[in-house]
């Protein structure tokens, strides 16, 4: 049990970029994908009512392109994510990249506006 606690502590100290690299390496080693498996839904009879469509509550802000003013975009990415200079620079130069995931709609729109004001092209998914 102490070994598991030590692993948890080590993983908690990883940066976002390090965690993403860990996921890639584990996917390659185990031959799996971290993508969520599609859920199979049994088709009901003709009398069954259609399930109401749920509105998305969590969004992902994706940097599509840094544009001409990379320095301002890097500064904004650092402010949003809390990444160090090198990690933020790598994220911006490696576009398209996920900047922040699991954020509310209002926050995702605010982040999009900030990044676009800095000169970046951004998508909210």
Curated annotation (Swiss-Prot):
GO CC annotations on file: cytoplasm; ribonucleoprotein complex; ribosome
Keyword annotations from UniProtKB, A to Z: Ribonucleoprotein, Ribosomal protein
Keyword flag Lyase: no
Any GO MF annotation of the entry: mRNA binding
Entries under InterPro entries matching the protein: Ribosomal_bL12, Ribosomal_bL12_C, Ribosomal_bL12_C/ClpS-like, Ribosomal_bL12_oligo, Ribosomal_bL12_oligo_N_sf
Pfam family, one: Ribosomal_L12
Keyword check for Glycoprotein: no
Top-level taxon in the UniProt lineage: Bacteria
Xref: SUPFAM superfamilies: ClpS-like (SSF54736), Ribosomal protein L7/12, oligomerisation (N-terminal) domain (SSF48300)
GO biological process, one term: translation
Database matches in HAMAP family: Ribosomal_bL12
Function: Forms part of the ribosomal stalk which helps the ribosome interact with GTP-bound translation factors. Is thus essential for accurate translation.
Subunit organization: Homodimer. Part of the ribosomal stalk of the 50S ribosomal subunit. Forms a multimeric L10(L12)X complex, where L10 forms an elongated spine to which 2 to 4 L12 dimers bind in a sequential fashion. Binds GTP-bound translation factors.
Name of protein: Large ribosomal subunit protein bL12
The species this protein was found in: Anaeromyxobacter sp. (strain K)
């Amino acid at each position: 049990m102490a070994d598991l606690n030590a692993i948890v502590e080590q993983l908690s100290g990883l940066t976002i970029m390090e965690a993403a690299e860990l996921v890639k390496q584990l996917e390659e080693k185990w031959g799996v994908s971290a993508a969520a498996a599609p859920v199979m839904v049994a088709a009901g009879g003709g009398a069954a009512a259609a399930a109401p469509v749920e509105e998305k509550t969590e969004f992902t802000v994706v940097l599509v392109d840094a544009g001409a003013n990379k320095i301002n975009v890097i500064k904004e990415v650092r402010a949003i994510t809390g990444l160090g200079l090198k990690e933020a620079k790598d994220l911006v130069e490696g576009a398209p990249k996920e900047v922040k995931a699991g954020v509310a709609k209002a926050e995702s729109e605010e982040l999009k506006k900030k990044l676009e004001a800095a000169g970046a092209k951004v998508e909210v998914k």
